[in-house]
Amino acid sequence: MNKYTLPKQSSSALISIDVQNDFTLIGAPMEIRGTHEKVLQMLQLLTAFRAAERPIIHVIRLYLPDGSNVDACRKEMIENGMAIAAPSTTGAELVDELKPDKLIRLTPEGLLQGEFQLLGKQEWAMYKPRWDAFYQTTLESRLHCSFGNL
């Protein structure tokens, strides 16, 4: 590493991606193997960022039951009735252990409109319409404008 690639802790943000029940919990419909085993390590990172009052953004997916916002590789499953990260379901929620407060619930209406949902001090959730959290979202501008030189 050099001075241009060395991480700067004082100006860093933490981004969690798809750490939702339907992708993380053992036996979940779209379990990503090995993710559940990493929840404790993720919690340690989140705890450190919370203590340092650094920004945290949880990037999530929400799939509408009609399949209108679903990636092509999952669209047929959703159209055939499979519920994956469906708005307002337990499966769409962030894993409880990683939330700043286990009672917090995602608000899909605002998230689906591109709003960032405040979860705690310096902590938000945001919806991504496709695989890339920067595609058709305001994530990049929010990181630069809201949090300074990250």
Tell what function each PLM region has.
Residues 1-13, 43-51:
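Short amphipathic alpha-helices and their capping/turn segments at secondary-structure boundaries
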Residues 3-4, 28-30, 79, 123-125:
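N-terminal start-of-chain detector that recognizes signal peptides
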Residues 12-13, 55, 149-150:
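Structural motif
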Residues 17:
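Active-site flanking residues adjacent to catalytic metal/cofactor-binding acidic residues
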Residues 21:
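Short, glycine/acidic-enriched loop or turn micro-motifs at the edges of active sites
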Residues 25-28, 68-70:
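Short, glycine/acidic-enriched capping/hinge loops at junctions between secondary-structure elements
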Residues 27-35, 83:
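Short glycine-enriched, charge-decorated loop/helix-capping segments at active-site entrances
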Residues 39-147:
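Active-site alpha/beta core segments
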